[in-house]
């Protein structure tokens, strides 16, 4: 990260270990106003932090297109994830990821709220068109290759929805309580995300609206810290759904 030809403090810190104590020193330099702006006013973007030289980054929705209701610029509309999965062609998924990533970059975006890799648990799920399959391995492979392709184009992807957003219908997605055994959770629903982190180097995820048991997925320490970071070694960012 540069400013007027000089590397900023953030620029020097990039590439350091996730647990490097210098990150704490860097964060201590943020002003109250900057932290407020970062957390409260970051709709489809990550705001600038002038004190440490962090620029604004812009994101856009759309698993099948770089563009959505929240942006005026649109890229090409691609076949949905289910159609892609039916090809069983991981190489094609990588090409798709690179293509949509290049379009996002051309339109001035830095990241995408995509792809989505929840399960086709029921034909009545209102978001099935965004998801690949009822098969965890196929979903994780196709999604992982898509993320790899976008990364080659310089675009990061917030893969969604972590986790179990498999029963959304109408406007009640924030009131869905999901119950299952831990074995089912790990072997079916978490598996694609585990592959993304451990095998494909995913750096960003989007949490889901629903609850796992009685705990909101976006506020679950068991999911977001114990499993995602402590077990899988995820060092990236998690954004809540909106």
Task: Label the model's feature ranges.
Residues 1-242:
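Glycoside hydrolase catalytic-domain context in secreted enzymes
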